[in-house]
């Protein structure tokens, strides 16, 4: 912003959060524009000023709670969730068997009753299906009828979290091949980037160690879905991306206790 002359960022991300940052910088006095080819142009200015701005709600967290509602046959209202930022997820959620009601205040996500349906999902950059949406959804797909396929095209080796799900009784196999119908850059690079989920399978409680942020929340969803008691270690990793998640779980009447 303060550099002299024109700065050009090519192949830039254009997710809603990035565009929201562009709005903030413009409010602060920046001269910044975004082209349709994902090029961001920034003209240097002498100074930036203060601003007032309401940050976007977290669409990853919203989708995580939606997947939890689907897996547990529950009902949750996510205050502040934006329909326009979650179009691809909402279409997938509905195809699997979830239902949602959009209001000015947020989105209500709930299980519509009956059996969940299997689906093929491929992750992609915005406006595609976010890579951070797939882990929570995989838990819900363990409860769907038939074979579901999730093809990860954004990051390699994102299915490590499925080991704990298999320990709980899920039938999930991971593959190096591209199984979603589209060849991606990981197809010939020996990465496990496709998963086949067979369901429905009852899950049972287990002792789990959280591997990372998104995988960890997915394990919480699995624990809520499972019969019996689960012990999930390393939940401090989840705090990083899910603010006050324990109080939110308690507000949903989840039988959960944090030991440390």
Which residues are covered by each model-predicted region?
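Short, structured segments at the rim of ligand-binding sites
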Residues: 1-260
């Amino acid at each position: 912003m303060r550099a002299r002359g024109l700065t050009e960022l090519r192949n830039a991300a254009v997710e809603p959060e990035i565009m929201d940052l562009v709005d903030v910088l413009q409010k602060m006095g920046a001269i910044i524009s975004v082209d349709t080819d994902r090029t961001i142009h920034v003209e240097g200015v002498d100074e930036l000023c203060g601003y007032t701005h309401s940050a976007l709600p977290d669409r990853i967290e919203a989708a995580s709670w939606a997947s939890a509602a689907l897996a547990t046959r529950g009902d949750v209202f996510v205050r502040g969730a934006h329909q326009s930022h979650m179009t691809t997820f909402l279409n997938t959620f509905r195809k699997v068997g979830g239902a949602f009601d959009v209001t000015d205040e947020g989105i209500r996500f709930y299980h519509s009753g009956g059996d969940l349906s299997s689906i093929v999902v491929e992750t992609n950059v915005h406006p595609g299906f976010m890579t951070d949406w797939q882990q929570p959804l995989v838990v819900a797909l363990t409860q769907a009828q038939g074979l579901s396929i999730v093809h990860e095209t954004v990051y390699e080796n994102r299915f490590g979290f499925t080991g704990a799900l298999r320990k709980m009784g899920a039938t999930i196999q991971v593959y190096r091949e591209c199984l979603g119908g589209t060849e991606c850059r990981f197809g010939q690079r020996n990465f496990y980037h496709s998963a086949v989920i067979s369901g429905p399978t009852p899950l049972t409680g287990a002792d789990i160690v959280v591997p990372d942020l998104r995988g960890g929340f997915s394990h919480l969803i699995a624990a809520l879905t499972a019969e019996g008691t689960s012990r999930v270690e390393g939940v401090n990793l989840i705090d990083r991306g899910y603010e006050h998640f324990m109080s939110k779980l308690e507000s949903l009447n989840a039988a959960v206790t944090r030991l440390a």
